[in-house]
Regions:
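PRPP-associated nucleotide enzymes
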Residues: 1-159
Length: 159
């Protein structure tokens, strides 16, 4: 919870141009990021409004990404018409692949402003988020959240 509180503080102090009436939170990898996104939506609320949240499912390392990319592209077209800004929220950015393809697709479809948030980000990630609470080095330690249980999809090692 302390990392989420720290992220909320950093975003508030940054004075970025977001408001619940014009900004949508994109919960990237809901199975890990739901708790983070929910807390940020409430803690960053303005004028009595919380931020709207949409889920963006992404593949596990052992899955093909094509279906996920097609699904996101179809949904984002509608979201870009409705919202001026987006805040992408991930509990952990390990390699940066998901944020890379998501933001590339967003830029192809619209010029809407977006900000990227990572509660934890690997120093070796190819994607560098706008807001990060904690950096870690996956050569030294694995990223593991207290709520995680063993997941067969992570037995695949693509390093």
């Amino acid at each position: 919870m302390a990392l989420i509180q720290e992220m909320s503080y950093r975003i508030k102090m940054s004075d970025i141009d977001i408001h619940p009436s014009k900004t949508c939170f994109l919960m990237v990898s809901p199975d890990y990021s739901a708790v983070v996104t929910q807390h940020l939506s409430h803690s960053l609320s303005m004028d009595g409004e919380i931020f709207h949240i949409e889920a963006v499912n992404v593949p596990f390392p052992d899955e093909d990404s094509l279906d996920y990319k097609v699904d996101f592209a179809e949904k984002y077209i509608d979201w870009a018409r409705k919202w001026d800004n987006f805040v992408l929220i991930e509990a952990g950015v390990i390699r940066g692949g998901n944020y890379t393809w998501i933001t590339q697709q967003m830029e192809l479809v619209s010029s809407n402003k977006y900000y990227t948030v990572a509660l934890c980000e690997n120093l070796g990630s190819k994607f560098k988020s706008d807001f990060v609470t904690l950096y870690y080095n996956d050569a030294v330690e694995d990223l593991h959240f207290w709520w995680e249980q063993p997941n067969n999809h992570w037995k695949f090692d693509s390093k």
